[in-house]
Curated annotation (Swiss-Prot):
It comes from Cellvibrio japonicus (strain Ueda107) (Pseudomonas fluorescens subsp. cellulosa). The gene is rimP. This is Ribosome maturation factor RimP. CDD domains: YlxS_C. Required for maturation of 30S ribosomal subunits. It is found in: Cytoplasm. Belongs to the RimP family. Keywords: Cytoplasm, Ribosome biogenesis. Disulfide bonds: none annotated. One of its GO terms (biological process) is ribosomal small subunit assembly. GO terms for cellular component: cytosol.
Length: 164
């Protein structure tokens, strides 16, 4: 039997793709009696507020018909942002050479938290460089991963755009 997250993903992917976006990630969170379905979408040129609104309306309609969530819930649709969460091996591979924050489910070399540069992806593992060393972290052990934005580069690009 498929998990709640898998069932939701199966319902949501066709909707998101039909609107020209990519499902970046999905988080199904319960806290007490409150449930939140958080959906991150992306596109080749990013996504706008209008994209998020369109996707939200369409997903809401599908969820109303299919009713995969018991009780009340909050639906949130947004861009993954500059500090985007990373969920899949393909997403980690897309950011080789970039800095990430990682939290692991189990300790590796006595640590559960790492910040470093992804140097490669190989055989289901991420090679992370930090403190002049490289550690191999199996992707399935990663509980949470986020890209660390390079704000200096972003500000430099923005300033260059203002000069044009």
């Amino acid at each position: 039997m498929a998990s709640k997250q898998e069932r939701l993903t199966d319902l949501i992917v066709p909707v998101v793709e039909s609107l020209g976006c990519e499902l970046w990630g999905l988080e199904y969170l319960t806290q007490g009696r409150y449930t939140t379905l958080r959906i991150f979408i992306d596109g080749p040129q990013g996504v706008s507020l209008d994209d998020c609104e369109r996707v939200s309306r369409q997903i809401s309609a599908v969820l109303d018909v299919e009713d995969p969530i018991d009780g009340e819930y909050t639906l949130e649709v947004s861009s993954p942002g500059l500090d985007r969460p990373l969920y899949t091996e393909a997403q980690y591979a897309r950011y080789v050479g970039e800095t990430v924050n990682l939290r692991l489910r189990i300790a590796v070399e006595g640590r559960r938290r790492f910040k470093g540069v992804i140097s490669a992806i190989e055989e289901g593992a991420l090679l992370l460089q930090f403190d002049n060393q490289t550690v191999r972290l199996p992707i399935e052990t990663i509980d949470k991963g986020n890209l660390v934005p390079r704000y200096d580069d972003i500000l430099r690009e923005h300033a260059a755009g203002l000069d044009e």
